[in-house]
């Protein structure tokens, strides 16, 4: 980045952007990859850059499984601690500026090692923005879990999901992209997550 990156202490951050599962195993190659997901990359980059320039938190979350992962009883083998678990190169250039990278063994980033402990330290936090994939799985699960987590702790934190910066996969006749995106939008909104077309709608 040519612009200056502002870094704040975790306790001072008022906003945090989480980049979810924009890794090789979901976006480029592997049993669960859908390369069309990368079409949201141009919409994600400005969100990351703005976060870095204004001192918001920036966190990367990627899948990272082992042969013993119970999740693999329901999904084909993917992101087994290899190249598939790495952030795609278009976004990896920003990962070096991330405050932290988390690796998860489930479809909900809240349970990634260290996540809850970190969130409880973020006493100034007012907004969380989620970008990445998949809208109806890891984005939805994290968004709803965060909503409940913050409510339980009486933390008044807005959770924002920009529709142009999240995506899911498409398998004709099995998993329709549009239908599953729309269903996830509704489920998230019904639990108190703010859905916006783009981050331009967010003051």
Please give the residue ranges for each predicted region.
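Short acidic, Gly/Ser-rich segments with clustered Asp/Glu that frequently serve as metal-coordination loops
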Residues: 22-30
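Metal-dependent catalytic neighborhoods of phosphoester/phosphodiester hydrolases
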Residues: 69-74
């Amino acid at each position: 980045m040519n612009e200056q990156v502002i870094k704040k202490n975790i306790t001072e951050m008022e906003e945090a952007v989480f980049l979810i599962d924009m890794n090789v195993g979901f976006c480029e190659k592997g049993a669960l990859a859908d390369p069309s997901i990368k079409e949201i990359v141009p919409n994600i980059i400005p969100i990351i850059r703005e976060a870095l320039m204004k001192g918001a938190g920036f966190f990367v979350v990627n899948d990272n499984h082992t042969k013993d992962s119970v999740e693999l009883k329901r999904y084909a083998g993917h992101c087994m601690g290899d190249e598939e678990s790495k952030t795609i190169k278009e976004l990896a250039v920003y990962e070096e500026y991330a405050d932290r990278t988390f690796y998860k063994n489930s479809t909900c980033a809240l349970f990634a090692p260290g996540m809850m402990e970190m969130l409880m330290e973020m006493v100034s936090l007012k907004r969380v923005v989620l970008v990445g994939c998949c809208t109806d799985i890891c984005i939805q699960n994290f968004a709803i879990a965060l909503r409940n987590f913050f409510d339980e702790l009486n933390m008044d934190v807005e959770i924002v999901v920009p529709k142009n910066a999240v995506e899911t996969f498409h398998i004709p006749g099995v998993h329709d992209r549009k239908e599953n995106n729309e269903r996830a939008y509704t489920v998230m909104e019904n639990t108190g997550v703010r859905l916006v077309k783009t981050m331009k709608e967010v003051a």
